[in-house]
Amino acid sequence: MGLPWYRVHTVVLNDPGRLISVHIMHTALVAGWAGSMALYELAVFDPSDPVLDPMWRQGMFVIPFMTRLGITNSWGGWSITGGTITNPGIWSYEGVAGAHIVFSGLCFLAAIWHWVYWDLEIFCDERTGKPSLDLPKIFGIHLFLSGLACFGFGAFHVTGLYGPGIWVSDPYGLTGKVQSVNPAWGVEGFDPFVPGGIASHHIAAGTLGILAGLFHLSVRPPQRLYKGLRMGNIETVLSSSIAAVFFAAFVVAGTMWYGSATTPIELFGPTRYQWDQGYFQQEIYRRVGAGLAENQSLSEAWSKIPEKLAFYDYIGNNPAKGGLFRAGSMDNGDGIAVGWLGHPIFRDKEGRELFVRRMPTFFETFPVVLVDGDGIVRADVPFRRAESKYSVEQVGVTVEFYGGELNGVSYSDPATVKKYARRAQLGEIFELDRATLKSDGVFRSSPRGWFTFGHASFALLFFFGHIWHGARTLFRDVFAGIDPDLDAQVEFGTFQKLGDPTTRRQVV
């Protein structure tokens, strides 16, 4: 036929058997990629430190998705939450990966079978003997089956009735684990951070899908609607399917970037807004304040801050700090976190406590400015020493650490004070190993950033694809150059697959 590359998919027009074949092959490729990627990630993943070197710091992409659905153990004897296990069972990370690869192989064979045996009786219209598909009926079948799967996931898997439950954590990502979830039927179910909404919405949407599927199986569309929406044309199916996919892609890009119960920070890393709003910093100060109210010393109060919470309050874990073309995991950027040095508290020679102004998300460099409790600038690291009034040396700034590895250690040497003031711009101070992975010191994004960018980009492309194919199917006769005043009744499109010039026509 000599088709140009952008028209090759016309070979499956008017050929239901091979249309099924290429879709099964597509499923084989997707499942095969997922299983292979899981095995690759398991080969390079280091589960030894779930606090300072979690999956999202290591750039894992498919492991978080398995984990949020209830997989936590490996045949290698480790658990994602730390510690060892002896009986991981079939549904370990490797078990899921293997199931995808086996499924991919079966789909590959099924695709070949359907390509060879394309001319099946089931695809033929018994009245004409020609291949045809009852698309409204197929829509009803698909709606019913997807509704069934949706209902089953919400009612059984998520609730733990027959399944493991899902990953649930506290608002600060400290206590996450897989557990069963009760459906939230009240207004709280609409809060995107309430896990119960996942169960209730799947049950509700699944029920609606089942009922809508049964409706479309039992009720035929009116003739005018059938013709108006071109329900007999497979390109209508393509257009509406693309619409469903791009809509879903936009939704998940939002839930990933802004955060929700479906994207826990323990699995995908914190969101940029948690840095922008000082979310973890406020919780840390609240806990320290509560400790001081119980007559604990500053050192005791800061020592009780979980290292995990302190690590979230570090700009290197902000997904918006990674550049668009900086490939690799976060560990390849600023290094592997080894330990929390503690919280630095700066004071001037008059004893005032000073706070380092933190770097906003979209800055690569930022002036080092120390302010007092009223927000008045008291010290800085000047650009021009000749005109400085507030330099660390002039103001006599000292620093003392509370909690962490340097607990109780203080420094008055200006060079050391300035070093820690610069590092305090980036949040809590951590010791980072940049030698092991030859990390270059340039921040990388987390899987949260990559997922969002990928899905938002493809959603935009698919949006244009929906418009393109929708317009093609609605205005096919116009695009084909058929004169609306034509006095011959043309059976258009029967042979568009092969471009057959012998289209039947009948003068009226």
Curated annotation (Swiss-Prot):
Record-annotated membrane-spanning stretches: 21-36, 101-115, 140-156, 203-218, 237-252, 457-472
SUPFAM superfamilies: Photosystem II antenna protein-like (SSF161077)
Cofactor descriptive note: Binds multiple chlorophylls. PSII binds additional chlorophylls, carotenoids and specific lipids.
A biological-process GO annotation: photosynthetic electron transport in photosystem II
Membrane topology: Multi-pass membrane protein
Keyword Lipoprotein: no
Assigned keywords, A-Z: Chlorophyll, Chloroplast, Chromophore, Membrane, Photosynthesis, Photosystem II, Plastid, Thylakoid, Transmembrane, Transmembrane helix
Annotated compartments: Plastid, Chloroplast thylakoid membrane
One Gene Ontology molecular-function label: electron transporter, transferring electrons within the cyclic electron transport pathway of photosynthesis activity
Pfam family, one: PSII
InterPro entries linked to this entry: PS_antenna-like, PS_II_antenna-like_sf, PSII_PsbB
Any one Gene Ontology cellular component term annotated for this protein: photosystem II
Major subcellular site: plastid
SUBUNIT field: PSII is composed of 1 copy each of membrane proteins PsbA, PsbB, PsbC, PsbD, PsbE, PsbF, PsbH, PsbI, PsbJ, PsbK, PsbL, PsbM, PsbT, PsbX, PsbY, PsbZ, Psb30/Ycf12, at least 3 peripheral proteins of the oxygen-evolving complex and a large number of cofactors. It forms dimeric complexes.
Function: One of the components of the core complex of photosystem II (PSII). It binds chlorophyll and helps catalyze the primary light-induced photochemical processes of PSII. PSII is a light-driven water:plastoquinone oxidoreductase, using light energy to abstract electrons from H(2)O, generating O(2) and a proton gradient subsequently used for ATP formation.
Homology family: Belongs to the PsbB/PsbC family. PsbB subfamily.
HAMAP family assigned: PSII_PsbB_CP47
Protein name: Photosystem II CP47 reaction center protein
Gene: psbB
